[in-house]
Every structure is written in structure tokens, then in C-alpha cells.
């Protein structure tokens, strides 16, 4: 039913990243999560038949970060998407624990769940499980990255996401600051999604705003770390103008740090931007604060991919993998923000 694919780049190591990658939307966060990585979409080949697709009645969604709001949203929307095709959706309860995730996946293999969509917490450790799934004739779809052993994958335009935010911030810097000022980046270098987003964000900004001084690049993917790292940056650079995050969660922590340091919420000389389309960030953008941009993923698009990619593998489609679209939202995009908020409700 499936074929193995050779990954074009080594996969990432331990990953908490998309726990905060909202949109995944993450959502996100989330999505949130989400990044050695290909700059462009990768597709896994698969073999099979249309009749195999008709027999696909169950899909297992293994999303380990069950404690975040995105999990509930993703399960709800994926269940509805599956139901349209007469498919029941199974879920794990990993509790953000890699050992629990491994145990739950082993159970699914023993039960021969016909299609598994898994967001590995530890990509290297998932290789053996994915290989065992393929050997058992099951479909394995990797969520948020790529494995050597897989039927297909679901990715989120990683590089483009960072590029959109970097470009938006650079344009704002030119318009509001005359191309001068100080910028700090909250980054991730632990997984494919994070590395690609980080590279897109930094490359786009520094290329388009060479007159803005880069004063810090700090690892942060969650609100608490973003808050702490931003406070440390502000202690050295209280006149920081721009803070860009690899996730909305980290950027939102920086947003709060700036306010705690005395920055007014609508300060005309401050720009915060993030990635995922996380609800707090979307609300801050809509309210006209200095949180001015998010590269947002639509939860409906992710949920549809969770169902459509395994179905495409089962049907024998040559390129079953999905690249979930991403779009930039800012203060003028009220309708788009409202639509994203509605999907997360």
C-alpha cells in the first residue's frame, strides 16, 4: 500500500516546537508547533489502488500535545472532515510525553489501525515505528516534518511562513522608522519546521532592512520563554523596536514583556510579529496593538489534510503529501482574522 521515501535532509531531533505552534493552527501553535530542512515542499510517493481507498474506514491522529487548545480544535475539525467520507477518527492521549506516544503508537500497530497521522515528538525515535507500520501494510503520514520511512507528510510552508513575517516587519521598519532601529528574533533550531521558519524570517528581514541593527537571536517557542528572553533583551536594549517570533506563542510572550517594560499597547514605534495564527495574537492584531502581523495557518486546512492525505495514499495517488497554505494577517485583515477565530472557537 505504501512505499518508502528517502528524506532529502536529516530530520530533526527532539521537538516541543509545535506544541506552541498554534495554528496549527496552528494551529497553531500550533501549532502551534511545526521546523537540515527542505526549503520547498516535499512529496512522498505511494502505491495502492482506488479500491484500497474505498476500504479506508479508520484514521488514527496522534497529536501529542493534548494540553493545548489547538488539540481540541484539531480533533473536532478532523473528526468532522473524516465523517464526510465515512471514516472514523481515532486519537491518542500522549500528554506531551514521548514515551507515552511511543507506547500508544505501538498499540495502534498491534491493532493494525489502517492509517496513522503522527506528529513525532522525537523524529529519530519515530523512524523505527514508522518503518514497522509500513512493514505491516499500514499507511504512515508524518505531520509537521519528514521521515525516511513514511507514506506521505503534511507540512506548513515552513520557509514561506518566516519570509512573510520578515518582509512585513521590514516594510514597516522602512515606513515607520526610516529603515533604522533595533530588531530581535525569537528563534528555534531544534526541528525542521523551526529552522526553516527562522531562516525565512531572518533572511527576509535582514535583506530588506539592512539599516536595522540585529541585537539578539534567542531560542524561544513558548510564551514563558518568550517573556523571559524578551525581558533579558530589553534589559540591554530598552529601545528595541522590533521583535519577531518563530511562533506566535513566543512572540506573544515578548509582546507582554514590552508592555511590562512600560511600552504602550499601541506604541507607534514598536512592531511584534509571529507565526501560526494563535488566538491571543490574532486578537491583539485585531485590537490595533503593536502586535502587527502573524503568518497564519487555518485549522480547517490542517484538519482536511489529516483526512485527505491518508485517503490519497490509499487511492494510490502519486503525490499524496500536503503543503498546508499560510497567509499573513495584519490590522487591516479583520475579515480574515474573524474567520480564523471562528475556526478556533
Regions found by a protein language model. Give the residues of each.
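N-terminal secretory signal peptides
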Residues: 1-13, 23-33
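Bacterial lipoprotein signal-peptidase II cleavage site
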Residues: 32-46
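Flexible loop/hinge segments that line or gate small-molecule binding clefts
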Residues: 124-160, 176, 182, 278-287
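Extracytoplasmic "Venus flytrap"
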Residues: 56-77, 81, 89-103, 107, ...
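Hydrophobic alpha-helical
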Residues: 115-134, 201, 219-283
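Hydrophobic alpha-helical segments within soluble ligand-binding/sensing domains
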Residues: 101, 154-180, 195-196, 226-227, ...
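Hinge/cleft segment of the Venus flytrap/periplasmic-binding protein
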Residues: 50, 55-57, 204-205, 297-345
Amino acid at each position: 500500500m505504501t512505499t518508502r521515501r528517502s528524506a532529502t535532509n536529516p530530520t530533526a531531533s527532539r521537538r516541543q516546537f509545535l506544541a506552541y505552534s498554534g495554528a496549527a493552527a496552528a494551529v497553531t501553535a500550533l501549532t502551534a508547533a511545526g521546523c537540515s530542512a527542505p526549503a520547498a515542499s516535499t512529496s512522498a510517493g505511494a502505491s495502492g489502488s482506488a479500491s484500497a481507498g474505498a476500504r479506508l474506514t479508520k484514521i488514527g491522529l496522534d497529536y501529542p500535545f493534548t494540553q493545548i487548545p489547538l488539540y481540541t480544535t484539531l480533533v473536532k475539525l478532523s473528526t468532522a472532515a473524516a465523517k464526510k467520507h465515512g471514516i472514523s477518527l481515532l486519537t491518542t492521549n500522549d500528554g506531551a510525553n514521548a514515551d507515552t506516544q511511543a507506547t500508544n503508537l505501538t498499540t495502534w500497530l498491534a491493532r493494525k489501525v489502517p492509517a496513522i497521522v503522527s506528529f513525532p515528538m522525537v523524529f529519530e525515535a519515530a523512524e523505527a515505528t514508522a518503518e514497522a507500520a509500513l512493514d505491516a501494510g499500514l499507511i504512515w503520514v508524518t505531520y509537521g516534518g519528514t521521515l525516511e520511512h513514511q507514506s506521505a507528510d503534511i507540512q506548513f510552508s515552513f520557509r514561506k511562513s518566516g519570509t512573510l513575517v520578515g518582509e512585513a516587519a521590514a516594510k514597516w521598519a522602512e515606513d515607520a522608522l526610516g529603515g533604522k532601529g533595533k530588531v530581535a528574533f525569537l528563534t528555534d533550531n531544534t526541528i525542521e519546521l523551526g529552522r526553516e521558519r527562522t531562516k525565512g524570517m531572518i533572511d527576509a528581514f535582514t535583506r530588506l532592512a539592512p539599516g536595522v541593527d540585529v541585537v539578539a537571536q534567542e531560542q524561544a517557542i513558548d510564551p514563558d520563554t518568550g517573556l523571559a528572553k524578551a525581558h533579558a533583551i530589553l534589559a540591554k536594549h530598552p529601545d528595541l523596536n522590533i521583535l519577531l517570533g518563530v511562533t506566535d506563542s513566543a512572540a506573544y510572550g515578548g509582546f507582554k514583556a514590552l508592555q511590562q517594560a512600560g511600552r504602550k499597547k499601541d506604541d507607534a514605534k514598536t512592531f511584534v510579529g509571529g507565526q501560526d495564527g494563535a488566538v491571543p495574537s490574532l486578537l491583539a492584531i485585531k485590537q490595533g496593538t503593536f502586535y502587527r502581523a502573524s503568518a497564519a495557518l487555518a485549522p480547517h486546512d490542517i484538519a482536511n489534510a489529516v483526512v485527505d492525505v491518508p485517503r490519497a495514499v490509499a487511492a494510490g495517488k502519486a503525490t499524496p503529501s500536503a503543503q498546508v497554505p499560510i497567509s499573513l494577517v495584519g490590522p487591516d485583515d479583520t475579515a480574515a482574522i474573524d474567520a480564523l477565530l471562528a475556526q478556533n472557537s
